[in-house]
UniProtKB/Swiss-Prot annotation:
It comes from Escherichia coli O6:H1 (strain CFT073 / ATCC 700928 / UPEC). Its cofactor is pyridoxal 5'-phosphate. Pfam families: Aminotran_3. This is Putrescine aminotransferase. GO terms for molecular function: diamine transaminase activity; identical protein binding; putrescine--2-oxoglutarate transaminase activity; pyridoxal phosphate binding. The modification N6-(pyridoxal phosphate)lysine is found at residue 300. The gene is patA. It comes from the Bacteria. HAMAP family: Putres_aminotrans_3.
Length: 459
């Protein structure tokens, strides 16, 4: 039976939500009611699959905490008042912490003046952010296109590469096995996870995948494409594969790929949506090898965990294909004043507080602790790896990974798996995590592994 629209129901629901937004605290009955509502509405109106996913990694087999507010820069508080150290970081968006006061203040100040742009007049913050990114990014990167997410940033990069290379007769893209570049149609064509790809086949033609970190395979693919007339427009890579399981390539790999791109006349697109903005101990992961891409993709942490924003930054030579018609690729909300205010404040915080260097220092401390645990629990842990504050613990099988996430939840530390590698639990906290909190995370991981070993022995 078709359901008739109900303005009265929608009005009541929106009014109830606005009342919740105004509240700072909930009493016990309000908390219980909100939990019930959220679970019901996820099941009936969002996607019940999300409930089952959270159930698999949450203490007691429950649906998990209903988040309520940030506890501090590095913690989350649920509706029951439980505080969690955030070692997931919203999949990499909270590099400067939760509700960083500098970022929040910038957004509030802009909101008091003008929240969105007119689309016709020139908006100053978009210009200032583009100038700032031109100064911040490596090499000859100069012009920025702004959007709202990582997958949009990748879509723009692919279209930009096509527009530049099509007159040169180059239409092929090379990506890598294990890659994750997003789930919109173009980005998904570069993504390498069959689970995400198969339901939407056929994807865009002209994409090939080679093993990540294997420079000989990259050379072979470029040569074969040249022989068959399928000349390569661009190679698209993550400097470190995040959703693939925090996979680091061999030293010198990015440098070698850059040389091959130059040799074959292919553009180099670096997807730093997850590795950028100080995450790996440098402002951008490509700086570890002083590699300069032709196109750089950013998002996630660019908005400081306050506003969604993505950016595609390119050299003048490449970006100039859009000069004659700047409307070839645009978005309504891309580069809006609130998002640009958040991004400018985020960059300011990262530089003023030298957070990339802090990420290197605290990341080394955490990784040393996790590697020690891997030595103590070889029956459970296969490897701990990472760079800066992008780390992973890989377990001997998927089930142990889920159990670890559940045990860490009991210890009030929030972690989760990676999308392309179910055996791997990602550790991706805010770069503002304190030394004391780092120690608590390692202690919680030790307790979690000890409890898991007891469970295995008793089984």
């Amino acid at each position: 039976m078709n359901r008739l629209p109900s303005s009265a129901s929608a009005l009541a629901c929106s009014a109830h939500a606005l009342n919740l937004i105004e509240k700072r605290t909930l009493d016990h009955e309000e908390m219980k009611a909100l939990n019930r509502e959220v679970i019901e509405y996820f099941k009936e109106h969002v996607n019940p699959g999300f409930l089952e996913y959270r159930k698999s990694v949450t203490a007691g087999g429950d649906y998990g905490a209903v988040e309520w507010q940030a506890g501090g820069l590095n913690t989350l508080v649920d509706t029951q008042g439980q505080e969690f150290i955030d070692c997931l970081g919203g999949f990499g968006i909270f590099n400067v912490g939760h509700r960083n006061p500098v970022v929040v203040s910038a957004v509030q100040n802009q909101l008091a003046k003008q929240p969105l742009h007119s689309q016709e007049l020139l908006d100053p913050l978009r210009a200032m952010l583009a100038k700032t990114l031109a100064a911040l990014t490596p090499g000859k990167l100069k012009y920025s296109f702004f959007c709202n997410s990582g997958t949009e940033s990748v879509e723009a990069a692919l279209k930009l590469a096509k527009a530049y290379q099509s007159p040169r007769g180059k239409f092929t893209f090379i990506a890598t096995s294990g890659a994750f570049h997003g789930k919109s149609l173009g980005a998904l064509s570069a993504t390498a996870k069959s689970t995400f790809r198969k339901p939407f086949m056929p994807l865009l033609p002209g994409f090939r995948h080679v093993p990540f970190g294997n420079i000989e395979a990259m050379l072979t693919a470029l040569n074969e494409c040249k022989k068959t007339g399928d000349d390569v427009a661009a190679v698209i890579l993550e400097p470190i594969q995040g959703e693939g399981g925090v996979i680091l390539p061999p030293p010198g790999y990015l440098t070698a790929v850059r040389k091959l791109c130059d040799e074959f006349g292919a553009l180099m697109i670096l997807d730093e949506v997850q590795t950028g903005m100080g995450r790996t101990g440098k402002m951008f992961a490509c700086e570890h090898e002083n590699v300069q891409p032709d196109i750089l993709c950013l998002a996630k942490a660019l908005g400081g965990g306050v506003m969604p924003i993505g950016a595609t930054i390119a050299t003048e030579e490449v970006f100039s294909v859009l000069f004659d018609n700047p409307f070839l690729h645009t978005t309504t909300f891309g580069g809006n004043p609130l998002a640009c205010a958040a991004a400018l404040a985020t960059i300011n915080v990262l530089l003023e507080q030298n957070l990339p260097a802090q990420a290197e220092q605290k990341g080394d401390m955490l990784l040393d602790g996790f590697r020690q645990l891997a030595r103590e629990y070889p029956d459970l842990v296969q490897e701990a790896r990472g760079k800066g504050m992008l780390m992973a613990i890989e377990f001997v099988d998927n089930e142990i990974g889920y159990n670890f996430a559940s045990e860490m939840f009991r210890q009030r530390v929030l972690v989760a798996g990676t999308l392309n590698n179910a055996k791997t639990i990602r550790i991706e906290p805010p770069l503002t995590l304190t030394i004391e909190q780092c120690e608590l995370v390692i202690k919680a991981a030790r307790k979690a592994l000890a409890a898991m070993r007891v469970s295995v022995e008793e089984a």
